Design a protein with these regions (language model features):
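N-terminal helix-turn-helix DNA-binding core of bacterial DNA-binding proteins
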Residues: 2-49, 71-76
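Amphipathic alpha-helical dimerization/coiled-coil segments
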Residues: 7-8, 83-96
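Basic amphipathic alpha-helical segments that dock to polyanions
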Residues: 53-57
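A short, conserved structural fragment
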Residues: 58-67
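Basic, amphipathic "hinge/linker" alpha-helix immediately C-terminal to the N-terminal HTH DNA-binding motif
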Residues: 69-88
Length: 96
């Protein structure tokens, strides 16, 4: 039986190892909630790749898609992941 820390690490690792996921979540956290805003805020990202990644994030309940307002909102899990991304950036600046 795996421990909570191992399970938690695996879940986070499965998401952050995917290209563009940190950038998408950080973009949403900065207020880019509409599809085109997210796309325009990330250089070199294609429509196809953004669609794929947003589908994964919705499926994993990291973001919620609001079809009425046509926007994406971070779930609590997504907010926690953004916090982790910023912490990792701080560690990189401090130690590398």
């Amino acid at each position: 039986m795996k421990t909570k820390i191992v399970n938690g690490f695996e879940v986070v690792h499965d998401l952050i190892k995917l290209k563009w996921i940190p950038e998408i979540l950080k973009s949403i956290s900065h207020g880019n909630e509409k599809y085109i805003e997210i796309l325009n805020s990330i250089p070199y990202m294609s429509h196809t790749e953004l669609n794929r990644k947003l589908a994964i994030l919705v499926d994993k309940e990291v973001v919620e898609k609001n079809n009425i307002e046509n926007k994406y909102v971070l779930e609590e899990f997504g907010k926690d992941l953004v916090h982790i991304f910023y912490h990792l950036e701080d560690l990189e600046e401090k130690y590398f």
